[in-house]
Amino acid sequence: MSIVRMTDLALSGKRVLIRQDLNVPIDQGRITSEQRIIASLPTIRVALERGAAVMVTSHLGRPKEGVWSEEDSLAPVAKRLSQLLGIEVPLRRDWVDGVQVAPGQLVLLENCRMNVGEAENDEALARKYAALCDVFVMDAFGTAHRAQASTHGVICCAAIAAGGPLLMAELDALSRGLKHPVKPLLAIVGGSKVSTKLELLSNLVNNVEQLITGGGIANTFLAAAGYPIGKSLYEADLIETAREIITVAKARGAEIPLPTDVVVAKQFLPGVTATVKTVDAIVADDLILDIGPQTARHYAALIETAATVVWNGPVGVFEFDAFSKGTEVLARAVAASSAFSIAGGGDTLAAIDKYGVADQISYISTGGGAFLEFLEGKTLPAVAALQARSG
């Protein structure tokens, strides 16, 4: 991918502004998950070790522009960065018009979404960001799909704009998995609604050899194939769309395997009685809440033969133990596979954590919405801007 990389630049004595994704959950001043902070450390350390004067900013939550609030302040993040790096990390509240920072020093710049014009990608604000630095580094893949002043405008205005190690690792992995995959390519797409994954499904069906669906999405495909689904979650108005996707797959010689058995209950509650049924035996008051054991074994066998696996979404209500087996079998199959595997999406990450297979997945994307848009085949604004600057 044609993007200037931070790691290829001489940074000694340079003022370097790094846009990170430090949007961590905070409860009463306490950070409850520091995954994104940990992920940012290698980039920051490289810049410091190379003698740069380092400024880091990020968004946190959705503050009102032009209004500082303690609730949306990066103060807890500054404190944690200081502890992890073993250096003082001062937080600068008013920084748009200038920041004092020396080579080898790190300062954290307050929540960039508090700045008026950030969300609208205001050019004047972007130029002020650019004036702060000799080198701007975009390292926040999780916000690469948003055209904002700190993720897009500044890239266009900065003297030098580069991709940070975290961003480039994400793009390299996604390109390997989707743009230049070793075949066969298998995708797992779960979730409650076809409508939220329609562009994703439509893009993947043109690239994969197998497309496994789960959750309410699979129910819609079952209904499209003429199977009864009882009172299960599905989208009647997208049955024809599901049929069109199946037709595209068949025309390419690709496969969208449907469940042959499922796990059902009468109510959507933890602790209810779970029953395995074949898909042609569903009655009016059944709720399909997981794939059945026969289907899980079949899908696991398909995963075993894949060379590249892309996973987004569970195949059942894995939060309830009675309906977690399908997702567990697939998670363990992906983990055991020799394929290059990419997983992303909040529920997917939760499943990976639940079954303890993170170390066996080739790449876990923390990108959220940016990950989904990449899977949909969309061009991410920040990535497009970095590519334009590399020329």
Swiss-Prot record:
EC numbers listed for it are 2.7.2.3
By its UniProt entry, which SUPFAM superfamilies does this protein fall under?
Phosphoglycerate kinase
Gene Ontology BP, a term: glycolytic process
Top-level EC class, please? transferase
Name the positions where ATP binds: 197, 319, 345-348
Where does the record place it? Cytoplasm
Q: Family per UniProt? A: Belongs to the phosphoglycerate kinase family.
Quaternary structure note: Monomer.
Q: What is the protein's name according to its record?
A: Phosphoglycerate kinase
**Organism (species):** Xylella fastidiosa (strain Temecula1 / ATCC 700964)
